[in-house]
């Protein structure tokens, strides 16, 4: 067990009325004041994490004590400032938990098991040595495990600790001395607790919260990546201006079944063949890994968007002959693990601990080895959708897809599980979803499964008083993948968007239009924003824009028409969609955990698309700059295109961006020029730019003539403009995204 160490006594102790804390640990019996107690907590977290092995240590750093500490400091006129500790990474999986991970011993507590080495040694020394278990607060000595070599512990950690995380707490004494510690807290529960305390308005004002700003609004599709892979790169994703990360389905699935053909084992598509929504265990990670991912992302202001696979269940390899889920071999493995080796593990992977019984309406506990779906929860048809039925609504929404059985909205069990799944995700801090294969869902199923919709959530401003009632309203990023291949699809998707104003959608129609415009002989002017016309039927603020989707390269030649003809075209298309107002680009990254196609070749063996562009985590230099431009201009409505001259040809698309763009001849503060041709283009942009500090957020260096002087501006270069018209040289196969980042100093010009 970790030993409590009071630490140095040179802490900013000004007020003798600070609380005293009695700490007993073995031979150590110390009486510490609040600040010394904070030092002890900091030592434990730095040495062992927030779930150390010792029972006393875990109790000491609980959120309950943290709230008492902060209340005591504020009552004694100390100032405190709280900020997320972005350097802290909880590596012990016991740090994460289901709210009420169930076992057979009762509700509202989690029971975990630790191996009793005294029993293993066969002696009666009374010396217990336990390995790391789940998480716990105290021993229940009269509750033995039903397994011979384990001892049971009760976990009675409050639900609100689920969202607790490590924060830096900077303490300033009344005399001005400062010291920084670490503490485990849940901000919202802290505010509620302190509201009930007898603090004055002045004392409340001394508690400041510093929350991370959202790095951007672009979405990274972390396809085929483990939760740990994503965690390890979180700071880089923030640097590249991602505000959202879409992750693989968070369910129980496996990369092969007992009778899965060898040629199908280990492939990516198994992630879209769920075995269970109630538990989380798959090649990408388990429930603890997922919770750690959500917490780490929030430290950087990033939201996690899971892929929701509600339409179909897995086929369990070619040998699955029933509709019991999870499959029999999975249930058998879980039971064997529980009885024979790691009984606490599977209970800790339960995402949905309880649901209401569809018949009795009584609260029903979920056990990981039980059957959760049966034949009555699926559509009756056992036929697959045939090639000539893709415009048949009945077939699309009731038949199987490649053998996968279709869930039915007529089943109360299905709807309750899906609805509770959404609720549990929200409890973990998930602020959005991607609804997979929406064209196969009846509107009723979408309506019932993700209801009630969460349209907005309250987010604290970057630097605010803990008790400030004003919050920043943030929209939740809910969107659906509705693959549009015909007019019927377009109509059905539009109907869904009309019914659900909380949903956005991937704009497949604009993708096809963009592919055609960037192809050889295609006309970029078809993508220009012109008065009285729109480039898409989906409202701009509800569009998710893509240049590649995981389905396109991974289904043989089925989606070849959805692929660009050249890597450079795919990259230039990303510059275009990142520059549009209100919409969000979805950037593709293949983490290569399961087998997948990472490159499409031409007939001559050269790369058509993919390769490094799909494997670089969405963090190439050009993508970082595109995302930065997008974050700068997403909320600025103005867009104006040039309709004549060298800036308006089949190969060149140019448009201004900024708030004042609707007045065509007023100075603008953003400029986009895309040249898909091989030849460089030089010309004068007809609209003046505002004076200011500008940055080249495009893919290539450009030549700009200012005051009769030609300057080479490389990507990422910041420079100052007096304003006025620009003469610009744009290289072939390149994109210029010029954005104003600040006001110019009067004394410095390029």
From Swiss-Prot:
Stretches of the chain forming a coiled coil according to its record: none
Biological process, per Gene Ontology: carbohydrate metabolic process
Molecular-function GO terms, alphabetical: alpha-amylase activity; cation binding
Domain of life: Bacteria
Stored Gene3D superfamilies: Glycosidases (3.20.20.80), Golgi alpha-mannosidase II (2.60.40.1180)
Protein name per Swiss-Prot or TrEMBL: Putative uncharacterized protein YgaQ
Species in which this protein is naturally found: Escherichia coli (strain K12)
